[in-house]
């Protein structure tokens, strides 16, 4: 029977495949076990009756998992009370101990490990005997014995695991002191709780801020409304038109906004003259809007001369000067560009 028990332990420790069901690295666990305890090689001195070697065994244990393959375990075992009865003597033997072992495991699947435990047990063995019709005697002994165990462990959840284990303890007692020196095999089922197995909640990166949206607003004012022909001084009607424009610009209130005033002329006159006139008209508009409240560092003037005419070739065949001036009126204009970053409102995440 002893050889069979050792063979079972070795076989259980010898299985191997590829996944991991051990607790997470550097975590603790605790559990309890219950099972069948069997004493072997009892050899009671002077016993002439039956010995009840099969008893109930139990224990509690705690451990520390270093990595998926190595852990250390400490536990208490109650190996059971073994009575014996005879014609000449009656009595009982009981043993218990504290063990410390290294636990070596190997994964079979994601949820199943095989393992072996190797270490020692500090035990205490007690006996009580009496001769029918005579006095009873008690004695005890303590010592250290090697412990070998093998088993399989199944993770029901990341925190809870169950195990099936066979444990062998050699030579528990001193025959000269308590009358026997048995070995013990304990086949048990255990349940353990593993601490610290919960995965940390993933950190959700905040949604990136939306890219700023740049918006541009265009306004076009007729130069004939703002200025007299061939002049750069604002007319009263022109000031009224700019007052209305300023109100619209104030309502826009663009973030980090800027205003560019572009002056245009018609093609009548030289290029140089028209360029200068367009710059003066644009600057007149800028100066007026600054006087109304637009910051001077947010507004600029640019003369465009006779470039970008909107009339195209519509007036090519118009010869009388007065008629040509009227025909080219759309080219004489002031354009205003307002650029700014539009605020993007994002909804809070639930």
From Swiss-Prot:
Its main location: membrane. GO terms for molecular function: porin activity. InterPro entries: Bact_OuterMem_StrucFunc, OMP/PagP_b-brl, OMP_bac, OmpA, OmpA-like, OMPA-like_CS, OmpA-like_sf, OmpA-like_TM_dom. The chain crosses the membrane at residues 27-37, 55-66, 70-78, 96-107, 112-120, 146-155, 160-167, 186-194. The extracellular loops are most variable in sequence, and in some bacteria confer sensitivity to phage and/or colicins. Pfam families: OmpA, OmpA_membrane. Residues 214-342 form the OmpA-like domain. The keyword Transport applies. GO terms for biological process: monoatomic ion transmembrane transport. The keyword Disulfide bond applies. This is Outer membrane protein A. Belongs to the outer membrane OOP (TC 1.B.6) superfamily. OmpA family. Gene3D superfamilies: 2.40.160.20, OmpA-like domain. Keywords: Cell outer membrane, Conjugation, Disulfide bond, Ion transport, Membrane, Porin, Repeat, Signal, Transmembrane, Transmembrane beta strand, Transport. CDD domains: OmpA_C-like. The lineage of its organism: Bacteria, Pseudomonadati, Pseudomonadota, Gammaproteobacteria, Enterobacterales. With TolR probably plays a role in maintaining the position of the peptidoglycan cell wall in the periplasm. Acts as a porin with low permeability that allows slow penetration of small solutes; an internal gate slows down solute passage. Required for conjugation with F-type plasmids; probably serves as the mating receptor on recipient cells.
